[in-house]
């Protein structure tokens, strides 16, 4: 969004219910927020539905935005929460680990503290494709921790799980991503 004054005019127009302002805001953020939705929801149509629902929430809450922080970050948080709500509604316990966890807490902590995957060296689409292959539980925790910079405590509160489950899901997500990427690059080299 170009500058704070321009943004403020658009937001004020949206709060007044002006369609032109709502359309301008939607068009400016649509692409970025759709990418956010795709990180959580693998199905294209479902991701677009989540995005629509998220923007409805954004428009409903615009009057509460105080311009003290990043507007895009504020919108992103609403979209992420909408995606998480959608996943939660579609599965019984989607954020609990997919397998029984036999990890000892120290091992999980050690794995989490290891160096982050070097996604900067990968093309974005390769990384997103690999992330999309993770289970909903692993993908969601990975996205929230690595891409959205939430802490394990915040993730646990958002998803209704304990911190240990968040750490375990992140560790397993990283292991699965390493396996997925190794297989992909092994296939490419062959």
Q: Which sequence ranges carry the predicted segments?
A:
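A short pre-motif secondary-structure segment
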Residues: 141-145
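Structural recognition of an alpha-helix C-terminal capping motif at a helix-to-coil junction
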Residues: 35, 49-56, 69-81
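A short, charge-rich alpha-helical start-of-domain segment used by transcription regulators
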Residues: 11-35
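Arg/Lys-rich amphipathic alpha helix in sigma70-family domain 2
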Residues: 63-67, 77-98, 172
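Short, Lys/Arg-enriched C-terminal cap helix and immediately downstream tail that follows
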Residues: 88, 134, 139, 171-190
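Sigma70-family region 2
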Residues: 15-16, 52-70, 89-91
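Internal acidic/polar
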Residues: 4, 93-119, 151
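Amphipathic, Lys/Arg- and hydrophobic-enriched alpha-helical face
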Residues: 26-44, 61, 131, 180-183
């Amino acid at each position: 969004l170009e500058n704070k004054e321009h943004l403020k005019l658009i937001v004020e127009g949206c709060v007044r219910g002006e369609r032109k302002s709502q359309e301008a805001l939607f068009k400016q953020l649509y692409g970025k927020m759709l990418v956010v939705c795709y990180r959580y929801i693998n199905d294209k149509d479902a991701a677009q539905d989540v995005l629509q629902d998220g923007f409805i929430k954004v428009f409903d809450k615009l009057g509460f935005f105080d311009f003290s922080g990043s507007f895009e970050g504020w919108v992103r948080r609403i979209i992420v929460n909408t995606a998480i709500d959608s996943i939660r509604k579609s599965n019984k316990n989607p954020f609990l680990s997919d397998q029984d966890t036999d990890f000892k807490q120290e091992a999980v902590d050690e794995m989490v503290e290891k160096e982050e995957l070097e996604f900067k060296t990968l093309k974005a689409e390769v990384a997103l494709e690999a992330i999309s292959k993770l289970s909903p539980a692993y993908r969601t925790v990975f996205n929230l921790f690595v891409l959205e910079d939430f802490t394990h405590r915040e993730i646990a509160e958002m998803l209704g799980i304990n911190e240990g489950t968040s750490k375990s899901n992140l560790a397993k997500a990283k292991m699965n991503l390493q396996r997925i990427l190794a297989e992909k690059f092994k296939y490419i080299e062959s």
